[in-house]
Amino acid sequence: MDFLRDVLQEYGVRFEESQIEKTFRYLNELLNSPHNLTALRSLDSAVHKNVAEILIPLKHENLRGSLLDVGSGNGVPGLILAIFFPELKVTLLDSKEKAVQFLEHVVRKLNLENAAVVKERAENFSREHREEYDYATARAVARLNTLVEICAPAVRIGGKLLFYKGPSFEEELKEARKALDELKVELEEVRRYTLKTGEQRCLLVLRKTDRSPEKYPRRVGIPFKRPLL
């Protein structure tokens, strides 16, 4: 736990000791899980890529309200945000059974009362829960145009979409112009940062400006197979 504590202090991330303990337990569960939900094999790399990478661009925020983590998979970023922002109600959404089993196990083990796990496709969930969330987030799920279509309908007007991307996001942003216009979303800010490992990252902060048309998201699979261009 000392390494986790030291790394977050070095990045300037504020925390309570209980959050360090829960995060350490989560990382151990992930690295030892039989479900093979991560390519990371060491605690060091997991601390940087699954914890610090998520918290650095939000270290001056006090997120509260409701957040939808689309394609939560191994719990990044949703579980980390649930641990470090206790006033945030987080929905961990994934359609894969092994991911859902792992997430439910960790939520129970850590007694995370502000996190809930849902097994469903994002296209269906966003259609059924229109404008219910203050935030939606995702990492390593899809390109930006697809993310906007499957996430924006679930976010209230004035709410934010927080997408974690690598440094070469400009091409995705150009591709996503139609999706942004159609779904009534605009880019508000790009937060660039560099991990101590030397890897460059960015958080795209987008804002929903108006109600997304009822025809979005399209039926399951279409936003991935035929993204808005």
From Swiss-Prot:
Keywords: Cytoplasm, Methyltransferase, rRNA processing, S-adenosyl-L-methionine, Transferase. InterPro entries: rRNA_ssu_MeTfrase_G, SAM-dependent_MTases_sf. SUPFAM superfamilies: S-adenosyl-L-methionine-dependent methyltransferases. Its EC number is 2.1.1.-. It is an enzyme of class 2 (transferase). The keyword Oxidoreductase does not apply. It holds the Pfam family GidB. S-adenosyl-L-methionine binds at G71, A122, E123, R139. It is found in: Cytoplasm. GO terms for cellular component: cytosol. Its main location: cytoplasm. GO terms for molecular function: rRNA (guanine-N7-)-methyltransferase activity. CDD domains: AdoMet_MTases. Specifically methylates the N7 position of a guanine in 16S rRNA. Belongs to the methyltransferase superfamily. RNA methyltransferase RsmG family. HAMAP family: 16SrRNA_methyltr_G. This is Ribosomal RNA small subunit methyltransferase G. It comes from Thermotoga neapolitana (strain ATCC 49049 / DSM 4359 / NBRC 107923 / NS-E). The lineage of its organism: Bacteria, Thermotogati, Thermotogota, Thermotogae, Thermotogales.
